[in-house]
Structures are given as structure tokens and as C-alpha cells.
Amino acid sequence: MAERYFIISGLLFVILFIAIFVYHFIKVNSFYNRVKDFCFANNFKFKKNPNKNVKFQITGFTKKYHWIFQNFIVKPNYISGDEIESYFQFSVPGVKINNMFIIGKAEMANSPGIEELDEKVVSMFLKNVLGEKVAEKLNDIIVIEFGRTDAFKFQYLTLSHKKANPLLIIDEELENLMANGFDWVADNDFSLVILPDRLIIKTNATNEISDIKTVIELGTKIIMRI
């Protein structure tokens, strides 16, 4: 009787294991199939696991720039016990622009004055985004405010080191996309910056095609304005 019980229990365990494996396999492949369909519909190129740190990669061409969308995966640290991190990164190598930087969203707080924002924003931008080598090359930084109306949820800050004629590439269409298209992103998981030779958008990864589309759409719209 006991032997029969163990056999049945073992079979149930095997069946459960197979069911979980099949469910995961179907779920993962269903996601990749939807990504492939999205790429095919937009003439993008899809590649799964281009290297050990990238789950999948999408490439496309807009105007004169080739862009790359990647789902990076950071392997866990077995010593510290840190969990696996997964994030999206949209990048455009070779963007030739030296006077434009964009920093992510800051929540509206009773329309704060420029003086209140300047020190905090510039300090965070230099420390977390540009790095010392790039920051050294900036002679002068000013903050130009956008979205000071109730039409948008967030305020975007554009930083430039050319006071006379800063290049403005954020308009209402872009700002609306940035404000309403990234509700799924936590504030500290979203960064967008144009460096002297590269545009980068980085945010947390999801399994929603609409989120992938939003990141690519934002990046390509910015490229079209450069």
C-alpha cells in the first residue's frame, strides 16, 4: 500500500513538473512570437539571445541612424544573493550632437521656480548620468522648463550648455508621449539622455509588447527631430 502511494505521488510530481515546464515554455514562446510579429509588421529585425547578457534584440533604421533595442539581463550575484535584473535599453550609436541633454521626469510640485530646481537637477544629472569626464567639458549649464501647464502629468527638464540658442527637440507631442506612455515605469527606473555620441533610453523590462513599442516610439521620434 505504501509503495503504491509513493508511486502515485511520484507520478503526480512528475506530471506537475512537466505541466509547469510546458506552461513556461508556451508562455515564453508566445511572448517571443508576439515580439516577432511586431518586428515583422514594422520591418524591424529580431534576434534572440545575441549574447549571454541579452535576451533579445530588435534593430531598425530611422532617418540616418541605426538604432538598437535590447532586453538586457544582469546575472545574479551568488555571493551577495542579489536577484536577476532585467531592463530595456534603446540606444542610437553615432548621434552627432554636442549641446543637448535630457533628464527624466520630475513630478510637478506647485510649479516650483527655476531656482529651486536648478541645483538639485544639475547635481543629479552630473553625478548619475554624465559622469565626470563628460561633465568637465560643459562650460555652462542652464535648465529649460517644459510642461508648466495642467495638460501634462510631469515636468521635463532639458539641460543645455549653449545659452544663446539651445537646441529644443521636445515638443508637446513628445512630452505627451513621455508623460502618458510610461505610467508603468517607476520614477527611479527610467532614464533618457543624449550624450555627444549616443542616445540612450533605459527602463525596467516587462512582458508587454506595448511597453516595448513605447520605448522604441519615443526613441525614434527624438531621432527624427535631431
Predicted regions and their residues:
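Acidic, Ser/Thr-rich low-complexity segments on the non-lumenal side of membrane proteins
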Residues: 47-79
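Transmembrane-cytosolic junction motif
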Residues: 18-42
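Generic alpha-helix initiation/capping and coil-helix boundary signal
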Residues: 2-3, 32, 212
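Feature marks short, highly hydrophobic, charge-poor N-terminal signal-anchor/signal peptide-like helices
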Residues: 1-11
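Charged, low-complexity intrinsically disordered regions
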Residues: 36, 45-55, 80-85, 89-226
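Core hydrophobic alpha-helical transmembrane segments of single-pass membrane proteins
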Residues: 12-18
